Amino acid sequence: MGARRLGRELALQMLYSRDYAAGEAAPLLELVLDESEPGAAAGRSFADDLVRGVLEHRQEIDTAITGASKNWSIGRMARVDLSILRMAMYELLFRSDIPKNVTINEAIEVAKKFGTEDSPAFINGILDEIASTLPDKG
């Protein structure tokens, strides 16, 4: 598994856990990271960036998700799906070094692993809607 995929999976677990625990996400990183995993250090760094970015820009991210999710309030979304969307939205809005199609494809792959049967299509629909309104990165 690549370092960024590992980082996304770690970040998802931290963001999801943080929704249910009062406190910081950093201690959770120790619980979910297997140091022997190839790419663990780079994955940890990327996960840390994603989590901090989502937390710092959460209001703007949630506003964008709400605007693109027709008939779905954030409160009705599955927590795993919402965490994946927040993570991907941070990448789309604030990480110019990651192409939009890579962000969307990675979010779909993470959703296949951690979400429900309907999660990949749901996440793809919202992210495609948002990505179509953003300028190309480059």
Swiss-Prot record:
The keyword Protein biosynthesis appears for this protein: no
Family: Belongs to the NusB family.
Record protein name field: Transcription antitermination protein NusB
Keyword NADP: no
Role, per record: Involved in transcription antitermination. Required for transcription of ribosomal RNA (rRNA) genes. Binds specifically to the boxA antiterminator sequence of the ribosomal RNA (rrn) operons.
Naturally occurring in which organism (per UniProt): Geobacter sulfurreducens (strain ATCC 51573 / DSM 12127 / PCA)
A GO biological-process term: transcription antitermination
Top-level lineage group: Bacteria
Annotated GO MF terms: RNA binding
InterPro entries (UniProt xref): NusB-like_sf, NusB_fam, NusB_RsmB_TIM44
Keywords: RNA-binding, Transcription, Transcription antitermination, Transcription regulation
